[in-house]
A protein has these predicted regions:
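Short, surface-exposed secondary-structure edge patches
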Residues: 95, 120-122, 163-167
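Well-ordered alpha/beta subsegment
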Residues: 25, 31-36, 150-185
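Single conserved hydrophobic/aromatic residue that forms the stacking wall/gate
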Residues: 1-6, 10
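A generic structural motif
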Residues: 16-22
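Short, Lys/Arg- and Gly-enriched loop/turn segments at beta-strand edges
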Residues: 96, 138-142, 179-185
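Anionic-ligand-binding alpha/beta catalytic cores of soluble enzymes and soluble regulatory domains
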Residues: 58-113
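Short, basic/aromatic beta-hairpin or loop at an interaction surface
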Residues: 102-109, 140-156
Length: 185
């Protein structure tokens, strides 16, 4: 899709769907459908686009991750084990939603799947890294939320002043890198 009239075709992927908006005065319908049919025939393991990997520093636990003790207890692990598991892999961004730039990350190790809070918080600070069920993610803005928080990143994942306000795209990867409080500050 990107190779022909990229600026005239808008696409947005989610978990099980793909939205494609286009201007039929600019992009021919038959050409577009032929291109889509070719894409549908690709091996799902074949790389279609170039993904980026973002290393995101996270200060885990303490005041930065107020729920890490509960996450560890729920999993039957120590806090250190939770941190090691959470930061040991690259997470695929399945989709963005809920808030501008909120990344729904897949591939969370089953050992640290954690239920959402029974009573969501009124305010979660921007940069909070949380777990909600089988997913992990980063809150891009101060907002209400029900995910359990295990850390905080100083990286601004959403900044309306940037040329591209949202740092990530669906299909990119995030790698969490533990940092000390001194490194965080």
């Amino acid at each position: 899709l990107a190779s022909s009239a990229a600026s005239d075709v808008y696409k947005r992927q989610a978990f099980t769907s793909l939205l494609i908006n286009y201007d039929p005065r600019v992009v021919n319908y038959k050409t577009l459908t032929k291109r889509l049919q070719k894409l549908l025939k690709l091996d799902v393991n074949e790389e279609i686009s170039t993904s980026r990997v973002f290393e995101i520093p996270v200060c885990y636990g303490g005041e930065y991750g107020p729920d890490i003790e509960n996450i560890a207890k729920n999993a039957g692990l120590t806090e250190e084990e939770v941190i090691k598991i959470h930061s040991s892999k690259d997470y695929l961004i399945y989709m963005l939603g809920f808030l501008p730039g909120f990344s729904y990350l897949g591939g969370l190790d089953e050992r640290i799947h954690t239920p959402r809070l029974a009573n969501p918080r009124i305010r979660i600070p921007a940069g909070s890294v949380g777990i909600g069920g089988s997913q992990t993610g980063i809150y891009p803005l101060d907002s209400p939320g029900g995910w359990q928080l295990l850390g905080l990143t100083p990286v601004k994942t959403y900044d309306p002043e940037r040329e591209n306000p949202i740092l990530f795209e669906a299909g990119d990867y995030i790698r969490f890198v533990p940092v000390s409080e001194e490194e965080y500050l």
